[in-house]
């Protein structure tokens, strides 16, 4: 693990055994942040954001953000880390990075993700923690569209937030790791191209409209964007125990010696994509005794399209490159080939670490900057994945990837 004077250490979050230690954890007093909504009030109602068959109404909180400014004085606009929370695409909140000390029924313990946020601020980064629509509010690619809209929002309002629109990175854990990889590696197949709401049909979100560039509207969601002329391309990304291939998650678990079904999962994949895999041929022939499931009211064709396109591994494999256009909004970063750091616990029984290994190997084959940290004995969501050393390594990797030290 490397360290640098430009990336201050976060000391004391864990003890020698890697267990959270509240007594020695740094206390960040008076954390300042601002909250808001990256989809403006009423916009999602007026434009009837597609839910792709989901069952629950959308509230304004689905588009909430917390923005934490850089705390280190810097002479130029700060780079921005957009943090995407986890929670099986159905739970979680953007507020998870607010408090560095968690108060639970069992007592106080360090919030290692918030400590990561504080370390980034101290290193000159701004951090934005965002919400997105849960799978019961919008099936995929709804959540992906939301994260990309958040990137566009901060890019469009960079001056107001004091950030550099060319130096935006995205990161997240678990479901947030999956979405972060999707944002990073689906790129911006028509960067800067404005798409009016009338120019893209509702079906084009699934790649069926000749008026939209190939893959573009399915991955981008510009038809319902308030900032369609702004790029969603990011300069770098990080995934903590994220899913890279939803098709293989259920075979990876038994192969790794874990149970096929995981209590934290509870059908998260089919609830996100619209059906179990393989996709049933007909809603009327669903056989629940065989484990087949379909979200009520979903279009089978949409579920099929989701199962074809919702996997970061397909976007990074050379033979399945999604995007071949280099974005002018992120110099040196080609669509589908964004620098990516991966962190995964070796004892992860929910998302086996092989899910990250495959992405790492694919990026190495393509000679794309990447790093993989495997954490011994760490389970899914383990605080040891955010140890001070790993936070240091993440800072160094992202600093290099966005060329933060260029000319400094």
What is the predicted role of each segment?
Residues 2-4, 12, 22-408:
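Alpha/beta-hydrolase superfamily serine-hydrolase fold, recognizing
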């Amino acid at each position: 693990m490397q360290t640098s004077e430009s990336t201050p250490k976060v000391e004391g979050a864990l003890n020698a055994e890697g267990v959270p230690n509240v007594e020695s954890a740094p206390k960040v007093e008076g954390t300042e942040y601002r909250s808001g909504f990256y989809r403006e009030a009423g916009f999602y109602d007026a434009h009837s954001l597609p839910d792709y068959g989901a069952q629950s109404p959308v509230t304004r909180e689905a588009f909430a953000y917390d923005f934490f400014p850089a705390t280190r004085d810097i002479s130029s606009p700060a780079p921005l880390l957009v943090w995407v929370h986890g929670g099986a695409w159905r739970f979680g909140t953007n507020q998870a990075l607010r408090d560095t000390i968690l108060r639970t029924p069992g007592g106080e313990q360090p919030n290692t993700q918030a400590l990561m946020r504080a370390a980034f601020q101290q290193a000159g980064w701004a951090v934005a923690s965002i919400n997105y629509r849960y799978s019961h509010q919008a099936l995929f690619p709804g959540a992906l569209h939301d994260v990309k809209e958040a990137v566009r929002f901060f890019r469009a309002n960079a001056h107001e937030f004091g950030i550099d629109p060319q130096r935006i990175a995205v990161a997240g854990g678990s479901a947030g790791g999956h979405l972060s990889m999707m944002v990073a590696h689906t790129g911006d197949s028509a960067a800067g191209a404005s798409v009016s709401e009338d120019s893209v049909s509702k079906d084009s979100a699934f790649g069926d409209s000749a008026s939209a560039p190939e893959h573009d509207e399915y991955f981008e969601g510009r038809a319902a964007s308030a900032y369609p002329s702004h790029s969603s391309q990011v300069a770098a990304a990080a995934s903590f125990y994220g899913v890279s291939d939803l098709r293989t998650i259920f075979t990876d678990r038994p192969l790794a010696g874990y149970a096929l079904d995981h209590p934290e999962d509870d059908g998260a994949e089919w609830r996100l994509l619209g059906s179990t895999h393989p996709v049933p041929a007909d809603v009327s022939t669903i056989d629940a005794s065989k484990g087949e499931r379909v979200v009520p009211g979903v279009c089978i064709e949409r579920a099929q399209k989701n199962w074809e396109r919702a996997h970061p591994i397909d976007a990074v494999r050379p033979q399945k490159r999604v995007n071949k256009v280099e974005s002018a909004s992120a110099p040196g970063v080609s669509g589908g080939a964004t620098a990516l750091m991966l962190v995964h616990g070796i004892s992860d029984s929910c998302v086996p670490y092989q899910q990250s290994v495959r992405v790492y190997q694919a990026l190495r084959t393509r000679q794309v900057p990447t790093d993989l940290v495997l954490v011994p004995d760490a389970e899914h969501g383990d605080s040891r994945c955010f140890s001070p050393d790993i936070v240091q390594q993440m800072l160094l990797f992202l600093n290099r990837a966005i060329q933060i030290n260029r000319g400094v």
